[in-house]
Amino acid sequence: MITGNEFYTVMCAMAPLYFAMFVAYGSVKWCKIFTPAQCSGINRFVSVFAVPVLSFHFISQNNPYKMDTMFILADTLSKIFVFVLLSLWAVFFKAGGLDWLITLFSIATLPNTLVMGIPLLQAMYGDYTQTLMVQLVVLQCIIWYTLLLFLFELRAARLLIRAEFPGQAAGSIAKIQVDDDVISLDGMDPLRTETETDVNGRIRLRIRRSVSSVPDSVMSSSLCLTPRASNLSNAEIFSVNTPNNRFFHGGGGSGTLQFYNGSNEIMFCNGDLGGFGFTRPGLGASPRRLSGYASSDAYSLQPTPRASNFNELDVNGNGTPVWMKSPAAGRIYRQSSPKMMWESGQRHAAKDINGSVPEKEISFRDALKAAPQATAAGGGASMEEGAAGKDTTPVAAIGKQEMPSAIVMMRLILTVVGRKLSRNPNTYSSLLGLVWSLISFKWNIPMPNIVDFSIKIISDAGLGMAMFSLGLFMALQPKMIPCGAKKATMGMLIRFISGPLFMAGASLLVGLRGSRLHAAIVQAALPQGIVPFVFAREYNLHPDLLSTLVIFGMIVSLPVTILYYVLLGL
């Protein structure tokens, strides 16, 4: 039975964290103390210094030679059970699919262990649980977040291949080469493809950034260069309603990617021409960055910092976009202002006003809303450019969609995943902490005091600043439940009921009993991890649902975890 003293101990551990979160919320929502630019600086400090150093501090002090193998096995089995069940559901049921597999796996198995788990479990079940939580943090950072990133890149690669090579053409791809400046396929930067076909019909595909081969002299010739800041800071706080700039599609095997951002611009990225923006008439050039991604997660895998690279289009006197001349192409393409038209319920195209296909005008705002919905539904919709003579043959007539061989896809995904992990500070902090702990506890080498105190002074700020950053993020959201009540309820049930049930089953299966079993169950009922939300936002996969679980879940998780604590103590 839980005593009042034990309950008070738990509240003493949790109240300071929530105090920091609500202070940040009030300072932005009501007092207007911090501007978004100032919030960006706070997030930058937390994401680059405070929390990576906090991770290093915990991991380096954990003895890897005394790891609780049964506890780790239970956690691993629970995640494997969930992944296998979701995979079977995605394969054998029409309602399933890779998109929901990724989202539901994130919700059910990846809680906020570092910031919430360590202080909460330590207050509930004692100091030994800190070691257990640190072990789970290591596994999350090194294994599970890498797996999640792999799945997201797989989805992005499939969308790109389907857009560029509909039907059976993709089956002929023998090699995919990714330029060094392409960090990810998430669409944050406009991409273009170049293809070569040998005498045997095998295709060699090259993925490039849209401006990687365009000289500065060509870029500077544009009449309407839009000034945008560099993305190297990459720490802005954003709302879930921030315009999405990561939706892209191609128009067949011609090497053209069409990239849609949330600034009412359409990015045309051609194999011969650099990508440029089409600005919505009447609104002028947008000051938003194409490559910018703002992360509210101060202690998660941060999106890959990239320098800004832009290639804008020329605009003549009447607002008609003009394709810039490319040294590779040696010619100039011009396109009149496009009209958006629906081809079917889930497929729409950009056609020339002189095209022969019947047209139904819709606003650019509607088109940009419809495009991500079609992608989320299955990734089968595409936008085509009629003026360039694209093939409008329905996908069903082309044949069943094929993909390159597993080896080709594996090489592609491993390449981009490795590049992305290499630019994440938490990757280095986790690995360095693990390496130091292996050395330190093997030969009893203490960390020098000057290094230890330097790390401690920064890591001590990690927990409070991480919660402060979450409060800033919550304050900037227009809605607490942006995904709607139905999806929010489903997500909460999966997070706070299904997750602990799978963890309890796996723990009992491996023989966990007593306080370790209770700690495993309560750990699975922690609020939603932030890293899955960052990935969901970056790859545009159900970000509203993950945002709801981050915001509302932080509030709901405290009474839920205490309820589990009380019930398990009966």
From Swiss-Prot:
Annotated (indol-3-yl)acetate binding sites: 51, 112, 114, 145, 530-531
Record note on quaternary structure: Homodimer.
PANTHER family registered for this protein in UniProt: AUXIN EFFLUX CARRIER COMPONENT 1B-RELATED, AUXIN EFFLUX CARRIER COMPONENT 6
Family: Belongs to the auxin efflux carrier (TC 2.A.69.1) family.
Membrane topology: Multi-pass membrane protein
Subcellular localization: Endoplasmic reticulum membrane
Mutant phenotype after disruption: Enhanced root growth and faster lateral root development. Altered floral morphology and nectar secretion.
NCBIfam families: 2a69
GO molecular function, one term: protein homodimerization activity
Extracellular side: 1-6, 60-70, 122-131, 452-454, 513-515
TM stretches of this protein: 7-27, 39-59, 71-91, 101-121, 132-152, 431-451, 455-475, 492-512, 516-536, 550-570
Species name: Arabidopsis thaliana (Mouse-ear cress)
Protein name: Auxin efflux carrier component 6
Keywords for this protein: Auxin signaling pathway, Endoplasmic reticulum, Membrane, Phosphoprotein, Transmembrane, Transmembrane helix, Transport
Purpose of the protein: Component of the intracellular auxin-transport pathway. Regulates auxin transport and auxin homeostasis. Directly involved in the regulation of nectar production. Involved in unfolded protein response (UPR) activation. Involved in the control of vein patterning. Redundantly with PIN8, inhibits the vein-formation-promoting functions of PIN5. PIN5, PIN6, and PIN8 control vein network geometry, but they are expressed in mutually exclusive domains of leaf vascular cells.
A GO biological process held by the record: basipetal auxin transport
Induction summary: Up-regulated by auxin. Down-regulated by endoplasmic reticulum stress treatment.
Any Gene Ontology CC annotation: plasma membrane
UniProt note on tissues of expression: Expressed in the vasculature of the primary root, cotyledons, floral stem, sepals and the main transmitting tract of the reproductive silique. Expressed in embryos, shoot meristem, root tip and lateral root meristems. Expressed in the nectaries and the floral organ boundaries of the anthers. Detected in pollen. Expressed in broad subepidermal domains that narrowed to sites of vein formation. Expressed in veins of mature leaves.
Phosphoserine PTM sites in chain numbering: 230, 308
